[in-house]
């Protein structure tokens, strides 16, 4: 399944114990259970003092982040992770 392939890909990436993990849409096209599994892996990895650079379109992934960098029309804007979602959506609109 797609969920199993994503989990296996992340497990392979983590096998070498990197301190920085780059993830591009790690939970794209997955069902809700698989998405939450992937998010939990990311939470645990970060809790161990590691860094994740995560590209996502999923609002639900924002809570995984300590800092958000939003891209719009080729411009980047950095926000704190606790920025209200309404403000984020207004910026992106």
Regions found by a protein language model. Give the residues of each.
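Catalytic Walker B motif of ABC-type/P-loop ATPase nucleotide-binding domains
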Residues: 21-24
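H-loop/switch region of ABC-family ATPase nucleotide-binding domains
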Residues: 55-57
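Hydrophobic anchor residue at the start of the ABC signature
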Residues: 10
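Helix N-cap at the start of a conserved alpha-helix in ABC-type nucleotide-binding domains
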Residues: 32-34
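Conserved catalytic motifs of ABC-family nucleotide-binding domains
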Residues: 17
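Conserved beta-strand-loop-alpha-helix hinge in the C-terminal portion
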Residues: 75-93
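Short loop immediately C-terminal to the Walker-B catalytic DE motif
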Residues: 27-28
